[in-house]
A protein has these predicted regions:
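Class I SAM-dependent methyltransferase "Motif I" SAM/SAH-binding loop
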Residues: 72-75
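S-adenosylmethionine
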Residues: 79-81, 88-91, 95-184
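Acidic, metal-associated active-site segment
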Residues: 54, 77-80
């Protein structure tokens, strides 16, 4: 499925941005043969399952956001998609060397602007992110534990979660320092 068909009416971006996203998708498909970036069963529907799933966070990034930190970046979802769509400094944290090289390749070949940190999040000095993102990395309570050094009052966390989202939110009910909001 080509990008305009897959995202018709879902995302309004320039032709240049769509071309960057298409080049990114082509690199995911190419590298998937060597590095397990995404579940192979999701490749036929990559535009909806990965690009659109990540792009839905863009409206939640306020204008003027300075720095976004994407942890457990893996194939770059949602970080690289947000880097293509938002005017913010994107930092991608990925501990796996092969995946970090993949992320660097995408940045170099597509012109998407981002910085890759090939290390575990626990070893990254605080970078002062306005927003922190993650997708399919860990439970909410574990994510907050891993990110403790990165979070300051006012940091917005945008975590893409699946079927267990409500249960994970409920497990955080004892934390009064967190404002929770579930988006469909």
């Amino acid at each position: 499925m080509n990008p305009p068909e897959a995202l018709a009416g879902q995302i309004d971006v320039s032709r240049e941005t769509m071309d960057r996203l298409a080049a990114y998708v082509a690199l995911v498909e190419k590298w998937q043969q060597r590095v397990n970036l995404v579940s192979a069963s999701t490749l036929p529907d990559i535009w909806m399952r990965h690009i659109w799933d990540s792009a839905q966070l863009a409206p939640l990034v306020p204008a003027g956001t300075g720095r976004i930190l994407d942890v457990g970046s893996g194939a770059g979802f949602p970080g690289l998609v947000l880097a293509a769509l938002c005017d913010a400094e994107l930092h991608l944290v990925e501990s796996d060397q092969k995946k970090a090289v993949f992320l660097q390749t995408v940045i170099r070949e597509t012109g998407i602007r981002a910085i890759v940190h090939n290390r575990r999040i626990e070893s990254l000095p605080p970078i002062g992110a306005d927003i922190v993102t993650a997708r399919a990395l860990a439970s909410l309570d574990r994510l907050l534990e891993l990110l403790e050094a990165q979070l300051v009052p006012g940091t917005r966390c945008l975590f893409l979660k699946g079927a267990r989202a409500e249960a994970e939110l409920a497990a955080l009910d004892t934390r009064s320092d967190i404002i929770r909001k579930l988006h469909p």
